[in-house]
A protein has these predicted regions:
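Hydrophobic anchor residue at the start of the ABC signature
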Residues: 139, 185
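ABC-family nucleotide-binding domains
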Residues: 160
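Conserved ABC ATPase "signature" region
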Residues: 106-121
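Catalytic Walker B motif of ABC-type/P-loop ATPase nucleotide-binding domains
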Residues: 150-153
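ABC ATPase NBD coupling module
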Residues: 63-75, 99
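Conserved ABC ATPase signature
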Residues: 125-129, 133
Length: 249
């Protein structure tokens, strides 16, 4: 489990003001928010790529050495490509082991590539595979270090519906059998119903969405069917309390 407490960040304006969030093991947490509300800033805090502006607990312990923790325990897939086009997929994965300071483990590499359904692309370069395959390879790259925390910034934004569904389902299958916390920052409504926990950035706080909303949707058999989910939501929840309305923005 990861706990972020008392997160306060101000640049030319206030981004976060005493915000908090908890990430659970073996689960996908999704953070929503309009552009400029601080989703990427939050990922950078969790990814230890910026000076800490919060109390950060990983497995109940404070972060003593951010550089080592980031190197060994955190995988981060940015919006920009994290793969090298002058290297094959296999060479990229080997390089991921090198970056994390771990010895190359071919069995682990093959297991992860199979879990992302890209094992047949080992000898291809990233610029010669499809967009969906490339994104799954980027996630595989981040998983090679066996991270405790995996951060994904808009991972499905450029994918069609088929590849979007495949990516999020493969990721969900993987993390529910591995002790990893996953945080996804996204605008993509197609993947919202895959979240174990949902948050939205509002008024400089990280606000949890009510679990009852998810449970009601599950009883209607629309879970994991994004189009039906959105239709149901509009028909049955739009007249409910104002605390729900921001979810559609």
């Amino acid at each position: 489990m990861i706990d972020i407490k008392h997160l306060s960040i101000t640049f030319d304006r206030v981004i976060f003001d005493d915000a908090s969030i908890t990430l659970s093991n073996n689960s996908i947490t999704i953070i929503k928010g309009k552009s400029g509300t601080g989703k990427t800033t939050l990922l950078n805090q969790l990814g230890l790529v910026a000076p800490l502006a919060c109390d950060y607990l990983m497995e109940g312990h404070s972060i003593e050495d951010p550089l080592t923790t980031r190197k060994e325990k955190i995988g981060y897939v940015h919006q920009e490509s994290t793969l090298f086009n002058n290297m094959t997929i296999r060479e990229n994965m080997k390089f991921a082991f090198l970056l994390s300071g771990q010895e190359y483990n071919e069995t682990r590499m093959n297991d992860i590539l199979c879990s992302m359904k890209i094992e047949h692309l080992l000898n291809q370069t990233p610029d010669h595979v499809s967009g969906g395959e490339r994104q799954r390879a980027a996630i595989a790259f981040a998983l090679m270090k066996d991270p405790y925390l995996l951060l994904l910034d808009e991972p499905t934004a450029s994918l069609d519906s088929i590849n979007c569904k495949l990516l999020i389902e493969l990721l969900s299958d993987y993390i529910h059998t591995h002790p990893v916390c996953v945080l996804i920052a996204t605008h993509d409504k197609r993947i919202i119903d895959y979240a174990d926990d949902l948050y939205e950035i509002q008024n400089h706080k990280i606000v949890p969405l009510k679990k009852s909303m998810i449970e009601e949707l599950e009883t209607t058999s629309v879970t994991r069917k994004p189009q039906n989910y959105l239709s149901y939501y509009k028909k049955h929840l739009i007249r409910s309390s104002k605390s729900y309305i921001y979810f559609l923005v």
